[in-house]
Swiss-Prot record:
Gene: purQ
Signal peptide limits: none
GO biological process per UniProt: 'de novo' IMP biosynthetic process
The organism's place on the tree of life at top rank: Bacteria
Descriptive protein name: Phosphoribosylformylglycinamidine synthase subunit PurQ
Active site (catalytic residues): 86, 195, 197
Alphabetical UniProt keywords: ATP-binding, Cytoplasm, Glutamine amidotransferase, Hydrolase, Ligase, Nucleotide-binding, Purine biosynthesis
SMART domains on file: GATase_5
Amino acid sequence: MKFAVIQFPGSNCDLDMLHAIRDSLGEEAEYVWHAETSLAGFDAVLLPGGFSYGDYLRTGAIAKFSSIMPEVLRFAEMGKPVLGVCNGFQILTEIGLLPGALIRNNNLHFICKTVPLRVANASTMFTGLYKEGEIIQVPVAHGEGNYYCDDETLLKLKDNNQIVFTYDSVNPNGSRADIAGIVNERGNVLGMMPHPERAVEEIIGGTDGLRLFESVVKAWKEEQVNA
């Protein structure tokens, strides 16, 4: 399986993402510069964290207009896996692949620590190797991770089982309904504020994030067999 790691000016988690895929997961991964216009040959797209375009205007707002974005939209429409982490999640909401928005943390401070997450939906292509209700430990590092949506959207997310991860015990940023990660209705686009790529090795704190990537590979292989 081959992963595309999209790089924007200001990305700073692209190295971690590539390392997680190549070295911990053992799959192929390549950087794709934001000015490219093709994702041919790739099986999954990863939008990493960082501060794309310096977060000017608002987080993800300028990345929305990158040349690669029409191809990311087409990729998602084809049902292929797209994962946006932190700034990547913010970009996914800006381009309309996911509902809602990420706003300033309610304490107005940058947060960088490992937090407990509850797996709210273990039936997606990203969470197939987790158990429903399982508590995992994944780092967060953001200043604008406070997920917001209106009441109608929140009800829809709950009804469609689109809430994949929630903060457990303590909500670090004020996100509505403790939301840490959501998928689109089709289930092939996941946006999450915590960084699974930083939780892939025991030596740096644990491997709870690795199963997310392993789940994607498992789902992809099953799809190839059934194709």
